[in-house]
């Protein structure tokens, strides 16, 4: 057998015909398969929007912001990459047009281009190229780079031109391009139509890129004759035309991709050393996904529920918590405003087994979150609060148990007489409008110390110190901690190691079986194969409540 190449390989994933085809999930599935074949894989997303990062974007437009360990605010696809690869990525995994142009303009202002006329080619493409190539370290066998947007978009052109240049510079044998296209079904004629894919590939060729494989997204099985036609008309091997119909679960996609032979085709074309796919961990996951022993109804009480992608990592973490308990988690999406009154909360939450209060910003919907927390506390329904969810638990305890009826957060009422939640000291200028909003929160991984005998210490398997990712500007006001503990019985069960910042709160188990919250975003570190303990604990409490154990 000839020796295999030791050069880091690049796989680029592009999309055609329509957006939201699942490029990120397909790329993640391919990455998972290559990792399961013994290869070292990292992933990256190129986003063509002009924002520097998604940190200031409307959740209704963009979905969630995924925060990495190093505090970068990134695209939600980075979350898919981490969950499928079971690998922590950093800020370099997300490149935006805004970042690229900001860097190039800053270099021009410093005179680094020595008087050159700064242009898209070569200056912008060189900067993109640098950000792609720096992923290819000695510890990496394969870099998978997803190109955001759709072939034909004006915004994507510099990225696609860069892909062409990378292929030219590192060698065609070291680069593989996967093009994902929609294969629409026309009901009246009963036909799958190949023409949109042909036109999409033609547009890609016009830029100078010939795809090596085509993934067909469709809602049904694809006949061999259709694959042969696309192979002929798009000039790819028939073995490289891959059908990827809609799956019951996103975690079924790797099996589909493998069944079509894409991963085997890729490793052979790129001359990569490989072994057979090790399915041990993934098969156990799929068994838990499709053969649950229990089913629970869980209410996710939020303000952005019209776009579920705004809570993507939360919903995946909740489902993973179900996998840990062999339970199917059926999510009931509840608009927080519907829980403002006791009657509204009872109507929305009376039939659920657990509740999750996720993060958010601004005062809209907060009174409903507080109402949902009160209902959960009074009816002993397991509840997990995340970020703003913790702050709302503190506000509810202050108002209803500690006799501070006007307790509030300075985020919602800057003139409140009882700011039980207040602005972090280093955030005062930003909140006052004297600093940039983007990239200035408390971001990234921070440690916490858990109290002995607490519920959170128990669910974290007895660990005294844990680390979680954060994204917030406000904190529990320490001036009220003693009063809340004494009057409301709320326990501050986890703090920063110096004791100054509240990181976890809970009620004692004899008061409530599982009313727990964290100032962090633990959903960002959950994996389908390694569920996060806080979510697993929530589902466990819900199963016990439902089964009476």
Curated annotation (Swiss-Prot):
Residue numbers binding L-glutamine: 360, 388-391, 411, 473
Region (Amidoligase domain): 1-272
A cellular component annotation (GO) from this entry: cytosol
Catalytic residues of the enzyme: 387 (nucleophile), 521, 523
Amino acids binding Mg(2+): 77, 146
Sites where the protein binds UTP: 19, 193-198, 229
A GO biological process held by the record: pyrimidine nucleobase biosynthetic process
Binding site residues for ATP: 20-25, 77
Pathway(s) it belongs to: Pyrimidine metabolism; CTP biosynthesis via de novo pathway; CTP from UDP: step 2/2
GO MF, one example: metal ion binding
Disulfide cysteine pairs (residue numbers): none
InterPro entries: Class_I_gatase-like (IPR029062), CTP_synthase (IPR004468), CTP_synthase_N (IPR017456), GATASE (IPR017926), GATase1_CTP_Synthase (IPR033828), P-loop_NTPase (IPR027417)
Enzyme nomenclature, EC number: 6.3.4.2
Activity regulation, short description: Allosterically activated by GTP, when glutamine is the substrate; GTP has no effect on the reaction when ammonia is the substrate. The allosteric effector GTP functions by stabilizing the protein conformation that binds the tetrahedral intermediate(s) formed during glutamine hydrolysis. Inhibited by the product CTP, via allosteric rather than competitive inhibition.
Keywords: ATP-binding, Glutamine amidotransferase, Ligase, Magnesium, Metal-binding, Nucleotide-binding, Pyrimidine biosynthesis
Residues engaged in binding CTP: 19, 153-155, 193-198, 229
Stated role: Catalyzes the ATP-dependent amination of UTP to CTP with either L-glutamine or ammonia as the source of nitrogen. Regulates intracellular CTP levels through interactions with the four ribonucleotide triphosphates.
Additional comment: CTPSs have evolved a hybrid strategy for distinguishing between UTP and CTP. The overlapping regions of the product feedback inhibitory and substrate sites recognize a common feature in both compounds, the triphosphate moiety. To differentiate isosteric substrate and product pyrimidine rings, an additional pocket far from the expected kinase/ligase catalytic site, specifically recognizes the cytosine and ribose portions of the product inhibitor.
Quaternary organization: Homotetramer.
Official protein name in the record: CTP synthase
Organism the protein comes from: Streptomyces avermitilis (strain ATCC 31267 / DSM 46492 / JCM 5070 / NBRC 14893 / NCIMB 12804 / NRRL 8165 / MA-4680)
Taxonomy of the source species: Bacteria, Bacillati, Actinomycetota, Actinomycetes, Kitasatosporales
GN (gene name): pyrG
